Amino acid sequence: HPARMVVDIHGMADHHGPDFCLGTGPQPGALEEMAVDILRTELEPFDVAVDSPFDASPHYTVTSLAQQHLGLAGLQIEVAARWRSPHDDAAAPAVSALSSALTVVDELLRDAA
């Protein structure tokens, strides 16, 4: 199957608050909504915000490029710094949860094709 969604993963500073922020971009559609619903469910009990503090709508974001110029769905995922240390076992639950959640998104997007 050809690509249907671009997922752009970023890091954000802890002071922004949530563990994860899902930015749906300037033209979110059904695939973005489905991905957000799945990620919010799969990432429990982490604090998952949507479009705040980062909505991925500025023209320079990968999500915006995908939606407005490539005809693809796009989603930006911001991960708080406290969950991004590759050598910190305390960060492992968030890394594992995000990996599992993205696998579920991938499977459901393939099924929706």
Which residues fall in each region the model found?
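Catalytic cores of processing enzymes, dominated by hydrolases/peptidases
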Residues: 1-95, 99, 103
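Short, hydrophobic alpha-helical segments
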Residues: 102-112
